[in-house]
UniProtKB/Swiss-Prot annotation:
It comes from the Bacteria. It is a peripheral membrane protein. Could be involved in insertion of integral membrane proteins into the membrane. Its main location: membrane. PANTHER family: MEMBRANE PROTEIN INSERTION EFFICIENCY FACTOR-RELATED (PTHR33383:SF1). Belongs to the UPF0161 family. The keyword GTP-binding does not apply. It is found in: Cell membrane. HAMAP family: UPF0161_YidD (MF_00386). Disulfide bonds: none annotated. One of its GO terms (cellular component) is plasma membrane. Keywords: Cell membrane, Membrane. This is Putative membrane protein insertion efficiency factor.
Length: 69
């Protein structure tokens, strides 16, 4: 399951994201964060960290540097 999630993130990064305007308010980007979190912690904990990050990625949040813990 972890490998599938990582594959889907890479697919998004290579084929979908280049066609969209840059919108992520954070560094690293949300997809990079998700890839690293799932690689490091697995699908459950990494997935929770990724969802929490995605919920913060909106115009009313200042963004900035937010590394994977």
């Amino acid at each position: 399951m972890t490998k599938l999630a990582l594959l889907l993130i890479r697919f998004y990064q290579r084929f979908i994201s280049p066609g969209l305007p840059p919108a992520c308010r954070f560094y690293p980007t949300c997809s990079e964060y998700g890839y690293e979190a799932i690689s490091r912690y697995g699908i459950i904990k990494g997935g929770v960290l990724t969802v929490r990050r995605l919920l913060r990625c909106h115009p009313f949040h200042p963004g900035g540097y937010d590394p994977v813990p």
